[in-house]
Amino acid sequence: MYSLARPFLFSLDAERAHGLGLSALDLAYRTGTTPLLAARIAPMPSTVFGLTFPNPVGLAAGLDKNGEHIDALFALGFGFVEIGTITPRPQAGNPQPRLFRLPAHNAIINRMGFNNAGVDALVRNVERARNRRGMLGINIGKNKDTPNEQAADDYIACLDKVYPLADYITVNISSPNTAGLRELQEETSLRQLVSQLRERQESLAARYGRRVPMLVKVAPDLSERDIDAAARVLGELQVDGVIATNTTIDHSKVAGDPLANEAGGLSGAPVLEQSTLVLRRLRARLPESMPLIGVGGILSGADAVAKMAAGAALVQCYSGLIFRGPSLVSECVEAIRRRREAPSRGAVAPL
């Protein structure tokens, strides 16, 4: 069915199509017609971060920034859904247009800029969700006008409010669309920020009697030296996991496209190779006990298997969902299942 709707959606402005697509998913969920869009997925339990995921394929942050579509998204068969990025205060993000499709490359460029309704609105939306069929991740960030020296205050403000509701929390320090944000990945800044967040995480765990895993999401544009430094810091501070990766600022693989020079982060097929390379390097440098989520360029089951082979315990997609539709979810799960059941065909770590 998505193949029929896609030409219409792609004829619209990308951000308008985004909103209409989510509204259509909500309608399908309310009317019980989601099975027309997405195949039923047999369980494939995967225990990671001490949590049991119904299957290892999730939705990356960015599609549902405010947690308004949680039930409808879980109905597509995702083993986990990550909402956000959310900030302490509402913000409009960057001026439109700010979202661009590059169909010839199965790619998207976005410069959204953490547009969201604020953490309090997200909390209300999560509390209204009634059918969480998998694990819910909440991705947190800082407001655009908060200087990096005070970034920890923003992350802690979000952490405090979403902690009771999240199954895991992602610290987003890698979006290219908030000026200066990626500087928080530099070794000294990273250590200062994550140490404060780890301290608050332990305090919240004691308060609520429940330890919610905290992950850090990194960029695909890190040098080998940066990867080494990040792995050293995150390993020493014992974060629960790492998500590799966010979008890239390198548009060389879409050179020649009419939209290639639009500012923003590039996602989709062109980022697969580099994001998987960063994933593999992190896996080699981080403690074996620290799981990784692989995201970036997954447009097929084979791409998902490649992420697992590179060291991911779980995978996420977003751009692939735009180009392939909901059938991508079941395709990825089944590809991972086949490889898991036939380990002699390739090295995918046990889930």
Curated annotation (Swiss-Prot):
Domain of life, source organism: Bacteria
Gene Ontology biological process terms, A to Z: 'de novo' pyrimidine nucleobase biosynthetic process; 'de novo' UMP biosynthetic process
Binding site for substrate: K65, N110, R111, M112, G113, F114, N172, N177, N246, T247
Enzyme class: oxidoreductase
SUPFAM superfamilies found in the cross-reference section: FMN-linked oxidoreductases
Keyword Membrane tagged: yes
Matches recorded under InterPro entries: Aldolase_TIM (IPR013785), DHO_dehydrogenase (IPR050074), Dihydroorotate_DH_1_2 (IPR012135), Dihydroorotate_DH_2 (IPR005719), Dihydroorotate_DH_cat (IPR005720), Dihydroorotate_DH_CS (IPR001295)
Cellular compartment(s): Cell membrane
Note accompanying the cofactor annotation: Binds 1 FMN per subunit.
Binding site for FMN: A61, G62, L63, D64, K65, T85, N139, N172, K217, T245, G268, G297, Y318, S319
Active site (catalytic residues): S175
One cellular component (GO) term of this entry: cytoplasm
A Pfam family: DHO_dh
Pathway listed: Pyrimidine metabolism; UMP biosynthesis via de novo pathway; orotate from (S)-dihydroorotate (quinone route): step 1/1
EC number(s) recorded for this UniProt protein: 1.3.5.2
Cofactor(s) essential for the protein: FMN
An example molecular function term from Gene Ontology annotations: dihydroorotate dehydrogenase (quinone) activity
Membrane topology: Peripheral membrane protein
PANTHER family: DIHYDROOROTATE DEHYDROGENASE (QUINONE), MITOCHONDRIAL (PTHR48109:SF4), DIHYDROOROTATE DEHYDROGENASE (QUINONE), MITOCHONDRIAL-RELATED (PTHR48109)
Matching HAMAP family: DHO_dh_type2 (MF_00225)
Assembly behavior: Monomer.
Function according to Swiss-Prot or TrEMBL: Catalyzes the conversion of dihydroorotate to orotate with quinone as electron acceptor.
Similarity remark: Belongs to the dihydroorotate dehydrogenase family. Type 2 subfamily.
UniProt protein name: Dihydroorotate dehydrogenase (quinone)
Recorded name of the encoding gene: pyrD
